[in-house]
């Protein structure tokens, strides 16, 4: 369904579960109409129906596989549609690979880069001109504290997303366009199950709630901050990862990866 009201419109990728679904719910509560995207059309339609019924908003559904150029281009075209401008962009879609790089599937590695790096880059490039023109807009990139450690392609991709967000945040200082990196730790979502990652034995205090993660990110972004790290435990971890010797950081990253296999 196309948005027809005068409410601000937010586009959320990977919107059917986890942090993406929490962002859709949070923005709906704030009065935004939504464009939600994911690969599973049935789940998208179900989510859209629930959001419309609960919040009385317009919800547009776009099925797109961001591991393909066609899928990325579909979202780009929507972001470039200035007749129904996107006020908020949430780059959330992502997945992990539960194998070491040397034995993982090469196409899967390329897909990871498309979804976690190329898609957010192209989406930001598509939406920023209109945001700058009207001097209004928010982009939140869902990164990860994994970007601070040596944890394979996923960590490398999240490191890129964090640094790119910080760079654009600095570039846009003095405007009303906000770019923000959300860097959560372990969050209760479908992410780990889909990636077949073993999370048994992870201490309870390390788990975060998706709704609280999203609320933290939104508050921080609207205050003009470049990034947010929800949870005191992850703030401490991020601080340590930046200042302890890199050999230790590399060992922590590799040990964490091994425990998940």
Put a short name on every predicted segment:
Residues 92-97:
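Conserved NAD(P)H cofactor-binding loop of Rossmann-fold oxidoreductase domains
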Residues 30-47:
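Conserved glycine-rich Rossmann-like NAD(P)H-binding loop of the short-chain dehydrogenase/reductase
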Residues 16-17:
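Conserved glycine-rich cofactor-binding loop
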Residues 171-233:
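SDR active-site lid
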Residues 100-113:
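Substrate-binding pocket helix/loop in short-chain dehydrogenase/reductase
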Residues 144:
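Residue(s) in the substrate-gating loop at a strand-loop-helix junction
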Residues 124, 157:
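Active-site helix of classical SDR
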